[in-house]
Curated annotation (Swiss-Prot):
A molecular function (GO) term: phosphoglycerate kinase activity
Protein family: Belongs to the phosphoglycerate kinase family.
Protein name: Phosphoglycerate kinase
Domain of life: Bacteria
Binding positions (ATP): 205, 296, 327, 354-357
GO cellular component: cytosol
Phylogenetic placement of the source organism: Bacteria, Bacillati, Cyanobacteriota, Cyanophyceae, Oscillatoriophycideae
Primary location: cytoplasm
Reaction catalyzed: (2R)-3-phosphoglycerate + ATP = (2R)-3-phospho-glyceroyl phosphate + ADP
CDD domains linked: Phosphoglycerate_kinase
GO biological process terms, semicolon-separated: gluconeogenesis; glycolytic process
Gene (name only): pgk
Length: 398
């Protein structure tokens, strides 16, 4: 998917032009303050490039799930304030995303100004990709930039619908980066390629495991999903999480890996607990010796070492999903060990593919050491699965 990008637009293309830019400002908020502004900062390179080239930037985003009606708690007021701070200039915030107020605010904009529209999901036409709503959103602008990778897997009015009314429609720098690393790792990786897949359920990672079996040399599995694989091997897993209806699938995935010559590694030891609780009693046991009534909540130290050795010669590593219940200190060591191993691998391309593994890496302060940290959860997974993302397909080809 080689798409036209903001970088290809010159000052003469943009000067005085009104640009509708879709960003992903769906940031975590607690007690009336933003707890992590990564997504806001991720949009800055595109916003700054547009304003420096003399464009009038009209920002749009969703926030939370207001289900098509106004929800006072889900207004973008805090986002507007933080944007003004990090951009070092006033960002005017509208109380709607379509209509008279928007039209008159945009009419007063000067070159280089930035305006933030209200939460697009206050209208059901956003998630319904209603052409009339998309047309109204687009009506105030001359061209379109999508830099919201986190929602690129959704065909919504602000990610897909508006492209029918605005030309050119191009990718921002964030989407360009995401495609370069994620698409690059799938289409033309430096080999050997390893994928580390974690998380609690096989069901949510089936697509990505199947797709990666066609691409990678090594597949390392961790997290709660491993117990479904152990059960498929006939092992006793105590009270560990098992998806009974996925046991046959686990067998077939192992068989497929063997058939394709992919090294598929599961942990050899696990940290088990007598209950799902931060204060639980714990012990480290071999996978053949999980006691009845106990549950596995992390990979063990021996497994972390085996995984580390397996990654030693890899030139590209994709990681999606934690190795254990890393939110609880007693079950965080496996995830921490993998994060540290990747941070130390300066001879390889390391891609942290969205979701909880990103949170773990950021918490440990290792983000800077990775080649790429994806801002998309579902979007990253779908791209790694080889699916086409509607928000990207809709953009102009190079």
């Amino acid at each position: 998917m080689t798409k036209k990008t903001v970088a290809s637009l010159s000052k003469s293309d943009l000067s005085g032009k009104k640009v509708l830019m879709r960003a992903d400002f769906n940031v975590p908020v607690d007690n009336g303050s933003i707890t992590d502004d990564t997504r806001i900062r991720a949009a800055l390179p595109t916003i700054q490039d547009l304003t420096e080239k003399g464009a009038k930037v009209i920002l749009t985003s969703h926030f939370g799930r207001p289900k098509g009606k106004v929800n006072e708690k889900m207004r973008l007021t805090l986002v507007g304030e933080r944007l003004s701070e990090v951009l070092g200039k006033e960002v005017k915030k509208c109380d709607d995303c379509i209509g008279d107020e928007v039209t008159s605010t945009v009419a007063e904009m000067k070159d280089g100004d930035v305006v933030l529209l209200e939460n697009v999901r206050f209208y059901s036409g956003e998630e319904g990709n209603d052409p009339e709503f998309a047309k109204q959103l687009a009506s105030v602008a001359d061209l379109y930039v999508n830099d919201a990778f986190g929602t690129a897997h959704r065909a919504h009015a602000s990610t897909e619908g508006v492209t029918k009314y605005l030309s050119p429609s191009v990718a921002g720098y964030l989407i360009e980066q995401e495609l370069k690393f994620l698409q690059g790792a799938i289409d033309s990786p430096q080999k050997p390629l390893a994928a580390i897949i974690g998380g609690s359920k096989v069901s949510s990672k089936i697509g990505v495991i199947e797709a990666l079996l066609d691409k990678c040399d090594k597949l390392l599995l961790g997290g709660g999903m491993i117990f479904t694989f152990y059960k498929a091997r006939g092992l006793s897993v105590g009270k560990s999480l098992v998806e009974e209806d996925k046991i046959e699938l686990a067998k077939s995935l192992e068989a497929k890996a063997k058939e394709k010559g992919v090294t598929m590694l599961l942990p050899t030891d696990v940290v088990v607990a007598d209950k799902f609780d931060p204060e639980a009693n714990t012990q480290t046991v071999s996978i053949e010796a999980i006691p009845d009534g106990w549950m596995g909540l992390d990979i063990g130290p021996e497994s972390a070492k085996v995984f580390q050795d397996a990654l030693a010669d890899c030139k590209t590593v994709i990681w999606n999903g934690p190795m254990g219940v890393f939110e609880m200190e007693k079950f965080a060591k496996g995830t921490e060990a993998i994060a540290q191993t990747l941070a130390d691998k300066q001879d390889a391309i390391t891609i942290i593919g969205g979701g909880d593994s990103v949170a773990a890496v950021e918490q440990l302060g290792l983000g800077e050491k990775m080649s790429h940290i994806s801002t998309g959860g579902g979007a990253s997974l779908e791209l790694l699965e080889g699916k086409k993302l509607p928000g990207i397909v809709a953009l102009d080809d190079q």
